[in-house]
Structure formats: C-alpha cells, structure tokens
Amino acid sequence: MKKQLLIAAVAATMTSVAFADISLTGSMKVNYTNKDTVGAASTNTVTQEGDLVLTGTNGGTKVHVEVSIDGGNSTGTANSSSANNMRTEDVWLSTNIGSVAVKTGTWNLTDTIFNDNATRTTGNWVLSTDVSGVNIAVEGDSNVSAVKTTLSGDIAGVSAKYVMKGTASATSTGKATAGKATNELYLGTNVAGFDVTYAMIDSDATTSDAAAFTIAKEFNGVTISYSDVDADASYKVTGDTAAFGNAAGFMNIGDDAKAIKLATSVAGNTVSARFVSVDALVAANDVDVNTFTVTRPLAGGTTLEVTYTDTDESGTTVDNEVLDVELA
C-alpha cells in the first residue's frame, strides 16, 4: 500500500511540472583574432561560442535552461578534444504566488557601471511585488549568503533604484566590501535631450565607496556619450562593457576611468569608436584603450563585426593591437 501511495505521489508530482509550451532557441558566433604585442610574436586564434536555450511555460510558470557550447581552438590545437567545453549555465524557475513574483535557480547578476555580470551564483531566490507603483524585491543566494532589498520605480520622470545589501561573508567576493553592508543608488533621466545616469555605492568598509555618471546625446545622427567612474582607494571596478569595454580588465583596486564613445550609421553599417583612459591609483599602471568597431548585417541572416583595439599601457613594453572579426 505504501509503495502504491509513493508511486501515485511521484506521478502527481511529474504531472504538476509538465509544460504546455516548450521552445528551443540558440545562437552561434565564430571569431578570428589577430593579436600583435610589442616584443612578442603575433598570435592568430579562431574561437566559437554557441548557446542553446530551452524554455518551458505552463500558465504563469516558466523554466529556463541555458547551455553553452564553447570551443577555443588555436592553429596548433584545432583538432584537440580538450578545445570544446559544454556546460550548463543559467537554470531558473519563475512563477507567481498571489501578487508575489518568485524566481529561483542559478543565473548571472545584473550588470552595473561598477560590476559586470561575470559571476554566476547558485541557490538564487527573488521575491518581488509592486506597492503603490514601487517594486519591492528581496533576494539572496547560496554563494554570498547575504540578503539584498531593492526598491525601484519612477519619480517625476526619473527612474530610481535603491539597493540595501546586508553583510555578506568576508570571503564571498574577494573584495574589500565583502563582509560589509552596502547601499547603492541608481538614477536615470533625460534633461534637455541629454540622457543622464548616476550611480553610487556607499559601503561600511573603509575607503570602499564609488560614484559614476554617464551623459549621452545624439548630434546630427551621431550619438556621443561620456562615462566617468571614481573609486575609493579600496574599491575595484570590474566594469561595464557598454561603458569601458575591455579596459575594465586592466583596472585594479582604487583605479578610476573615463570613456568617450561615438556611434553612428554609415551606408547600412553601424560604426562606433570608444576611447577609454584608466587613471590608476599607481601612475605607472595607467592604460589607454581605443576601440573601433564596424557592424554589418549580411544577406544570409548573419552579422559581420570587425573590431580593432589599440592598448597602450604606461611603464610597460607589452602594448598590443588586436584585430577581431566576428561572424554571428
């Protein structure tokens, strides 16, 4: 009898998670990269990155599974079996319990001008609801073991988000702010045709605050944006590729950065240029990164992107130039 009850319970559980709609989408890109470094031989690499996304929905419930299929093949290892890497990335479930939206699983954190989303945390959970036009979200994860509360909404044409982070474990992130509570504020609006954003981090940790702003406007078909981030001596900016591109990878604790970006369309091509200057806490570590990109949609449904990057590092002889051709 107990076995029959157990079988019935399992069958009921399996039925309850069946999905009415299942979709499978994906993307693929291939990159050829030539890197010419001062004092070293130039290198040529071909890499590919594929993603498959499986989504199942049943009413207001959704399950999302993302699988990455990457391969980093150089000219010398093109036939190496170790060059390919297939792994599960984001896996999460979202649903609603009354007026409360629930999401749980594994995913990347949200990009900000201070931090990219490279860190994927597990055991994530988010509970959110709207109260009088303000979205209130409470979230946490198994990696950091700290609860975060976010208030967001629009106030007189200004989008605002205020984040209160509880004390995380001191070894959870490797940053000075680990083990310390932080408050974050993000504002965005349009002033006389200029898109303006402002962000700040106020940490209980010593000399670990940061502030940043971006201003952008279109002039005669050319969008010009300026971004600036100022970090205290113990805070490290890990970057937002939209603002600082690859230059964020050169930033260390206490470094500041400024970026100017221009973007326009020419004969069906999207053309952009970005000039980033990293003002390092140690002057000998200053870096300038200039990037030029041309993107064009092709008739076959793919997109061709050509990027040239020139990196000039102060006090070193490892300046380099990189040409990257991407088909996606």
What are these regions (language model features)?
Residues K2-A156, Y162-T167, K175, L185, ...:
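Beta-barrel outer-membrane channel/assembly domains of diderm bacteria
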